[in-house]
Amino acid sequence: MCLVAFLAIAPAGWHTLQMKCSSQSEFPRIRRPLADLPQLLELGDPARSRSVPDDAACFALWDKYDMLPNIRRHSFLVAHIAATLAARAVASGFDVNVSEVRAGGLLHDIAKTYCVRHGGSHAQVGAAWAVAETGNYAVAQGVMMHVWWPWDLPAGRGICALPFFVMYADKRVRHDACVSLEERYDDLLGRYGHSEAAREGICAAFRQGKNIESALSEQLGWTLNEDSFDCGRLVS
């Protein structure tokens, strides 16, 4: 089932889809356990002293945790997009650690292979591994939150932070190709939307992704949905 069919809307283009998925009346508010916890500290504060794993260190962790080749390709593109966003933020006057954002992208799916084989939340397991292996809590936060942000999105400049760069980048990469959010979530619905609850969760994540996209576009002065981030050159 495609995302358009699930939403029962006429094939009037993705703009209609965006408006439909933005309607809070269509789906109940998705409740996740983390939403009942206090919001995390601002772990992305560049003033905090911590080491940042470079590419070689991240690739070594890929090997250590036996990351599948397709997940490596996906993670490499996510890191590229996230770092591109972070570099644009720095150029726009934001205090962002680009290397740290890149590390968050490279490691966001570090536990995906393990959880595919053995079960569990790859975001939660991966965040625990990221803390244990790097001691960098900001990178671990990016790993932990790359699937779903359980609190209200920060207003204004607060959106330009590591978790949202990694989260948005992940939402723009289907396997090893940069695609629109609409294409990404149409694929997710086809593969995982086998129940009403699953379909509601996918659509909620799509809406959140569009909200992040709009907020980042506004802060960075960049029409993100029209940009492919030169990803084609990385996988050609």
Model feature map: region roles:
Residues A56-Y65:
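A short small-residue
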Residues F6-I9, G13-S49, K64-F94, L107, ...:
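Divalent metal-dependent phosphate-bond-processing catalytic cores, especially two-metal-ion Mg2+/Mn2+ enzymes
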Residues V78, V96-A130, Q141-P150:
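His-Asp-centered metal-binding catalytic motifs of divalent-metal-dependent phosphohydrolases/nucleases
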Residues S49-A56, V101:
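Acidic-glycine-rich active-site phosphate/pyrophosphate-binding loop
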Residues A57, S121-H122, F164:
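Alpha-helix N-cap/N′ positions at the starts of helices
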Residues F59, A83, A127, A140, ...:
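Short glycine-/small-residue-rich flexible loop motifs, especially phosphate/cofactor-binding loops
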